[in-house]
């Protein structure tokens, strides 16, 4: 086994696809990466809440009162009253009848998809969906048809031509994590109605960022009351904490409690995390200026990059990719940016399609206009050095 896996590691290295862990300590708009302070353009901490003192104090208070860990799964003796408080806050925020917290976005997607989708169902999935959605669909053992990214015409054609099934599912990210573009939810809802399907939306990168009170993209488009729509969200990005959730009707939550294996067979979240989650939900609603600032900074950053000639794809969110192409050039650009004090990571296949390696930048409300302008100057210089722009 050692020889075989060592050969594979060497292959990845030759293709500039080998990854490594780097020591990182993030605080506000800054990250100390391998001992060097840098402007953090690689974080999903969109609203700058990860080191907000109110989340920290809520977590510390809960840890002092209730201990460091849950000690059991939710269905045994790990369902702490703080779960009820956080889920009640979720229901109020999302205007939902019921809510259920999972340990992470990955386990939420795996758990929900495998619990609800069966072998006799058909799934229609955007080709650029997150790995957790892809894995959940695979584990469900349902037949899956992948449609080209955002290609509504192809999706409708697949729905029309598909064989009879117990249930049809359309599965999509709300905001695509490597491209920064938004799912055409209004058109997907129309197809869901027309072909009597269920729409499952992963709001990981849209929760806290879009919607009147940061509820997400479904609320942004006024689709939150639509029937046969399931929304999954996370606490680990804009909300600055950890964990994930599903919101919907009571029967859905009750069914998941009894069937979602990733919920049933894992230790519950620590009380400190649950307390921070509840605090974050209230802050997101009470401080809309964080979202306003985030969108203004994102627009400033994206506009400046486009004017310089960079390809930012279809980005319309705080996630702004610069498409580079070859893996080695993306790695070289990332290294040059880090030398200049900008933390930005090269994203390569299989995370993105072959030939589309990129630097994935993400903007946060913790940044300033000066941070944005300095970053753009550094990106321009790095882009010129690798021949990406003239």
UniProtKB/Swiss-Prot annotation:
<dbReference type="InterPro" id="IPR050087">
    <property type="entry name" value="AON_synthase_class-II"/>
</dbReference>
<keyword id="KW-0808">Transferase</keyword>
<feature type="binding site">
    <location>
        <begin position="105"/>
        <end position="106"/>
    </location>
    <ligand>
        <name>pyridoxal 5'-phosphate</name>
    </ligand>
</feature>
<dbReference type="InterPro" id="IPR001917">
    <property type="entry name" value="Aminotrans_II_pyridoxalP_BS"/>
</dbReference>
<keyword id="KW-0663">Pyridoxal phosphate</keyword>
<dbReference type="InterPro" id="IPR015424">
    <property type="entry name" value="PyrdxlP-dep_Trfase"/>
</dbReference>
<feature type="binding site">
    <location>
        <position position="177"/>
    </location>
    <ligand>
        <name>pyridoxal 5'-phosphate</name>
    </ligand>
</feature>
<feature type="binding site">
    <location>
        <begin position="202"/>
        <end position="205"/>
    </location>
    <ligand>
        <name>pyridoxal 5'-phosphate</name>
    </ligand>
</feature>
<dbReference type="InterPro" id="IPR004723">
    <property type="entry name" value="AONS_Archaea/Proteobacteria"/>
</dbReference>
<keyword id="KW-0093">Biotin biosynthesis</keyword>
<feature type="binding site">
    <location>
        <position position="130"/>
    </location>
    <ligand>
        <name>substrate</name>
    </ligand>
</feature>
<dbReference type="InterPro" id="IPR004839">
    <property type="entry name" value="Aminotransferase_I/II_large"/>
</dbReference>
<comment type="pathway">
    <text>Cofactor biosynthesis; biotin biosynthesis.</text>
</comment>
<comment type="subunit">
    <text>Homodimer.</text>
</comment>
<dbReference type="InterPro" id="IPR015422">
    <property type="entry name" value="PyrdxlP-dep_Trfase_small"/>
</dbReference>
<comment type="similarity">
    <text>Belongs to the class-II pyridoxal-phosphate-dependent aminotransferase family. BioF subfamily.</text>
</comment>
<feature type="binding site">
    <location>
        <position position="19"/>
    </location>
    <ligand>
        <name>substrate</name>
    </ligand>
</feature>
<protein>
    <recommendedName>
        <fullName>Putative 8-amino-7-oxononanoate synthase</fullName>
        <ecNumber>2.3.1.47</ecNumber>
    </recommendedName>
</protein>
<dbReference type="GO" id="GO:0008710">
    <property type="term" value="F:8-amino-7-oxononanoate synthase activity"/>
</dbReference>
<dbReference type="Pfam" id="PF00155">
    <property type="entry name" value="Aminotran_1_2"/>
</dbReference>
<feature type="binding site">
    <location>
        <begin position="234"/>
        <end position="237"/>
    </location>
    <ligand>
        <name>pyridoxal 5'-phosphate</name>
    </ligand>
</feature>
<feature type="modified residue" description="N6-(pyridoxal phosphate)lysine">
    <location>
        <position position="237"/>
    </location>
</feature>
<dbReference type="InterPro" id="IPR015421">
    <property type="entry name" value="PyrdxlP-dep_Trfase_major"/>
</dbReference>
<comment type="function">
    <text>Catalyzes the decarboxylative condensation of pimeloyl-[acyl-carrier protein] and L-alanine to produce 8-amino-7-oxononanoate (AON), [acyl-carrier protein], and carbon dioxide.</text>
</comment>
<dbReference type="GO" id="GO:0009102">
    <property type="term" value="P:biotin biosynthetic process"/>
</dbReference>
<dbReference type="GO" id="GO:0030170">
    <property type="term" value="F:pyridoxal phosphate binding"/>
</dbReference>
<feature type="binding site">
    <location>
        <position position="351"/>
    </location>
    <ligand>
        <name>substrate</name>
    </ligand>
</feature>
């Amino acid at each position: 086994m050692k020889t075989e896996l060592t050969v594979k590691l060497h292959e990845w290295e030759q293709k500039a696809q080998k990854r490594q862990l780097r020591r990182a300590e993030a605080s506000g708009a800054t990250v100390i990466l391998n001992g060097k302070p840098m402007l953090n353009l690689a974080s999903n901490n969109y609203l700058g809440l990860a080191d907000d003192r109110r989340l920290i104090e809520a977590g510390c208070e809960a840890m002092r009162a209730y201990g460091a860990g849950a000690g059991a799964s939710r269905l045994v003796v790990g369902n702490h009253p703080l779960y009820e408080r956080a889920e009640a806050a979720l229901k109020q925020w999302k205007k939902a009848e019921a809510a259920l917290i999972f340990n992470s976005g990955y386990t939420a997607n795996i758990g929900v998809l495998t619990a609800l989708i069966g072998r006799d169902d058909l799934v229609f999935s955007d080709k650029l969906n997150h790995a957790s959605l892809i894995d959940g669909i695979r584990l469900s053992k349902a037949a899956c048809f992948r449609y080209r990214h955002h290609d509504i015409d192809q999706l409708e054609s697949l729905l029309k031509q598909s064989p009879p099934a117990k249930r049809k599912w359309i599965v999509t990210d709300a905001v695509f994590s490597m491209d920064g573009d938004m799912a055409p939810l209004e058109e997907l809802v129309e197809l869901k109605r027309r072909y009597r399907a269920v729409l499952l939306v992963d709001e990981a990168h849209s929760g806290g960022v879009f919607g009147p009170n940061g509820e997400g993209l479904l609320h942004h488009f006024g689709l939150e009351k639509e029937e046969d729509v399931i929304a999954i969200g996370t606490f680990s990005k804009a909300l600055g904490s950890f964990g994930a959730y599903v919101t919907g009707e009571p029967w859905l939550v009750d069914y998941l409690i009894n069937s979602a294996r990733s919920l049933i067979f894992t230790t519950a979240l620590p009380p400190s995390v649950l307390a921070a989650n509840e605090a974050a939900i209230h802050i997101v609603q009470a401080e809309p200026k964080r979202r306003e600032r985030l969108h203004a900074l994102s627009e400033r950053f994206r506009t400046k990059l486009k004017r310089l000639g960079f390809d930012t794809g279809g980005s319309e969110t705080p996630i702004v990719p610069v498409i580079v192409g070859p893996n080695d050039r993306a790695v070289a650009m990332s290294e040059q940016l880090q030398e200049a004090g900008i933390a930005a990571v090269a994203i390569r296949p299989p995370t993105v399609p072959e030939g589309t390696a990129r630097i994935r930048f993400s903007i946060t409300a913790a940044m300033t206009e000066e941070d944005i302008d300095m970053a753009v100057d550094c990106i321009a210089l790095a882009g010129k050095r690798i021949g990406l722009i003239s």
